[in-house]
């Protein structure tokens, strides 16, 4: 990244390949990189919640293992948040298949807003809370919660595609039952999670409780217990 004043927190979620070994070798030669491991597989959003607690910077953003960021992504987003009252800066993304071909959406467009690209002012987590203990979709729920709390003007969207996302056969967006389809449509489990989370935001937790949401996630096998992380 062209913006070099960054802290990189990486967590290995009990991978079965040599990911942890590779990450540790990088951290050995780059003091900005700190490496953690899950005690037990716990999914991306529990890990994010844990790493947010460890982070020292004023801005938080994320990078999934199968994504590639434009070299100027961090710099552009930092500049927006430093010079704007917004609390989140997002960018577009392009999905690329393993053969290098771009995956278009149902409207024949190649780009879409990328929720994973969100750069968030750290103090927002103290107000809104962290991500739900879900295997999928918790970043979208967080995004919608911020809009309801702070208004749409609190989020700035950069139209440039600053992330390439691998559209391969692995990953939660491709697994049967949790998939986001190539044309932009999503699985039944994702739709139901989105619906119940929206009802909770509108009606309040006295009507739609966290237990209700957890029950739906559990029925689909999407609820994940927190196992913690270790260095």
Regions found by a protein language model. Name each.
Residues 1-230:
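Nucleotide-sugar donor-binding/catalytic module of glycosyltransferases
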